[in-house]
UniProtKB/Swiss-Prot annotation:
Residues 1-23 are annotated as: Disordered. Kelch repeats lie at residues 177-221. It comes from the Eukaryota. This is F-box/kelch-repeat protein At2g44700. The keyword Cell membrane does not apply. Keywords: Kelch repeat.
Length: 368
């Protein structure tokens, strides 16, 4: 998401790695923009929040269109979109990926893919961590198992077990760590974190929210160094990973789905049935409408970050193929100004025709 108050500078910005960028940003920022863009495009996106904290100029660069264009040419970002077919029992999952065609900055490919699941029959939360998907138990049967699927190589492996068995919980990625809150017994560790570098679990700050049911959520997201549990009626509860403090806020009285929300440049976006696309102003603790375009009251919507834009995916009945429906996609550019966030919608694209029984259940943003 770009900002009208902080345009990227053509020269004067970061170094050939995230470490050197932090150590001597002025030297890095003096390089030509084209070189800076290609360097930063190769840095894993989970380090971008760290780079953004170096300086305002660095933050503008990391969020600039030039970086997203460079990442696009490298094919760094992609979406994993999952459907379940409700016409059959047991229910089966069908997965597709949306990714850029090689050496293109605009054309996308939507194709069916094989997707392995952990053998344990529990229900799992699925969380995108760079190019990997973390499976953590999310059911009434507590489990300490962690499974990790690497989308680059199609490999599913077992990760280190959690410190305690957990049932329903809230999961989020903040600052190089995966946090798990809730789903514990009274005498157990209330929250823990998994360090992506050391590959180890450790106890995290104890949440001051004493009601453990607050972490039984419809969806979870991470922004502002917080992990947030979203519930339809109870609103949003956010856990601050720095000190365990928790904050509650209301959500609009409208319908939304767990696939219809995402975070872009540290801003939470949710698509509501009546209100449309909205964003959460964390400073004012208000929900605000994204203006500037019309989504025609789309239903069964999934959204995700895709090269700095919001990928908007929805279903509608097929007029040409009986007992089928169409999957459509359009990209929405986001511009933040002093008055709010405006969206610029690109042309819609029909990407697939699927059976009527398919229902979108996952929309994961992954990155290399």
């Amino acid at each position: 998401m770009s900002s009208s108050n902080e345009p990227p500078r053509k020269t004067d910005q970061p170094s050939s790695s995230s470490a050197s960028a932090s150590a001597s940003p002025s030297l890095f920022l003096s390089l030509p923009l084209e070189i800076i863009s290609m360097i930063l495009a190769r840095v894993p996106k989970r380090y971008y929040p760290i780079l953004c904290s170096v300086s305002k100029n660095m933050r503008s660069l990391v969020r600039s269109p030039e970086i997203h264009k460079a990442r696009s040419l490298l094919g760094k970002d992609y979406l994993y979109i999952g459907f379940i077919d409700e016409n059959y029992r047991p229910v089966y999952d069908y997965w597709y990926t949306l990714r850029r065609i090689e050496n293109s900055t605009t054309e996308n490919l939507f194709e069916s893919i094989e997707f392995p699941y952990p053998s344990e029959p529990n229900r799992f939360s699925m969380n995108a961590v760079g190019p990997k998907i973390f499976f953590i138990s999310e059911s009434c049967t507590p489990s300490s198992r962690l499974s990790i699927f690497d989308t680059r190589f199609g490999e599913l492996r077992q990760g280190p077990c959690l410190l305690v068995k957990r049932g329903y919980n809230c999961v989020g990625l903040v600052g190089g760590k995966v946090y798990v809150i809730g789903g514990y017994q009274d005498d157990e560790i209330a929250a823990e974190s998994f360090d992506l570098n050391t590959q180890t679990w450790e106890a995290a700050p104890i949440p001051d929210e004493k009601e453990s049911h607050r972490w039984i959520c419809k969806a979870n997201v991470s922004f502002d160094r917080k992990v947030c549990a979203l519930r339809s009626r109870e609103g949003m509860t956010c856990y601050d990973t720095r000190d365990g403090s928790c904050q509650r806020s209301e959500m609009p009285n409208d319908q939304w789905s767990r696939v219809g929300l995402c975070v872009i440049d540290n801003v939470l976006f949710v698509y509501f049935s009546r209100f449309g696309l909205m964003w959460y102003d964390s400073k004012l603790m208000l929900w605000r409408v994204v203006y500037g375009f019309d989504l025609d009251n789309a239903r069964s919507v999934g959204i995700g970050e895709y090269y700095g834009k919001l990928a908007f995916i929805w279903e509608k009945p097929s007029l040409n193929v009986s007992e089928s429906k169409e999957i459509w996609c359009r990209m929405i550019g986001l511009l933040r100004s002093e008055v709010g966030i405006h969206g610029a919608a690109e042309p819609s694209q029909l990407v697939e025709i699927v059976p009527n029984g398919y229902r979108m259940c996952h929309c994961l943003s992954l990155s290399g």
